[in-house]
Amino acid sequence: MNYNNFENSKGDGHSRLPKPTYSGTLSDGYDESKIKRQKTDSAFNAAYSPHMYPNSPYYEGSWNTGYTPQLHHVAPHNQYFHPIQPSTQYNYTSPPNYTENYIPPVHQNISYAPALNLQKWPSSYCENTQALKNDKDYQTSISYEDVAIPTVKEIQLIEKNRGKDTFMNEISPVPSSKDQASAEPTEIPRKDPELANSNAEDDHNNLGLEDDDRDEQLESEGLGKVVLVPGTSIALITDEDVKKWREERKKMWLLKISNNKQKHMQEMGIKEDELKSQPSIFKESRKEKQFIQSIQNQVQRGNPKIDLNLKLIQREFANENSQLLDFIRELGDVGLLEYELSQQEKDVLFGSSEDNNKNHYKPNYKNRKPNLSRANFTRNK
């Protein structure tokens, strides 16, 4: 290609090389940067002429040049064989200034309806209006003014004549709003924080003194504080019970936990059989707990479904057992059951002691002879 025709715009005599274009073809100096996108719609098909279908207006695809689109009649899908029937159900009438597609004119001032002129009220109207009465105009559906909510204060008073506790309830209802309104307002004096703290400390000290006085009175009457042993249901009330409990615990510690058990047993003159025969409180409580838990599990366990076949079999067994028991009772009444079995008969019926030992015998498979192991066998013998 000859590049001599391309002169430089600066006029320095040098040739100008062509610039790359978006379309991929060399240009003759025309700037194609404006044309960035080709035509989107397909070319117009001459088989479907626009004068045959005047009722189908569409916008024509335009170049990306920034101009407004032009109206052009383009036939949609194959309407040559199936033309569109004119619609007769809805006939809209367009205003005279509107176009065929009901598009309003561009350069035209559209007049709107004037806004309503609201009358302005003078400021004196708001000032002269009557004030609303809260008692008559606005009322709630339920009046809570006459409702009195009582509060119950339970004060525990201890009567020391019989050693029983009695509870006395003092009910102090809250006065209603009418009573509060009728009562004369009283001025509540302000309390100093120092005086309030001192009063609180005095009240606390007084309570402590009252508790000490009660304990002293109970001790004088022979009733000490109830001491509960943790982990058991043992309650120690008097001082004698506490002393006995301490002595018993000390004794059991020396006889069971101490390293010199034999020495303490000889000093106290107690034998091992006596210690074993003494029931342990913790073991007994554990047994009771397990027994109660087993009963609860039986109660809470779901009952199985009733099987009629099983019930019939059980009823037959019960009838047969009743007949056998009646027969055995008759034999006992006659005196035919007063017979002592010999040792041979007992062995035949119930088995001998040797047979029982044989059943309990378990061979020791671990202590095998070393010659019987597979490693000691020789292949060629």
Curated annotation (Swiss-Prot):
Q: Where does the record place it? A: Nucleus
Disulphides: none
Composition bias type Basic residues, residue spans = 359-371
* InterPro entries, A to Z: NUFIP1_cons_dom
UniProt keyword DNA-binding, yes or no: no
Respond yes or no to whether keyword Phosphoprotein is given for this record.
Answer: yes
The record's GO CC annotations read: nucleoplasm
Post-translational modification N-acetylmethionine, affected residues: 1
Question: Which residues lie within the region annotated Disordered?
Answer: 1-38, 164-216, 350-381
Tell me the superkingdom of the source.
Answer: Eukaryota
* Chain positions found as Phosphoserine: 172
Q: Give a GO biological-process term.
A: box C/D snoRNP assembly
Q: Pfam families under this entry? A: NUFIP1
Keywords recorded for this protein, A-Z = Acetylation, Nucleus, Phosphoprotein, Ribosome biogenesis
Other notes: Present with 259 molecules/cell in log phase SD medium.
* Function according to Swiss-Prot or TrEMBL: Involved in a late nucleoplasmic step of 60S ribosomal subunit assembly.
Q: What's the name of the protein?
A: Ribosome assembly 1 protein
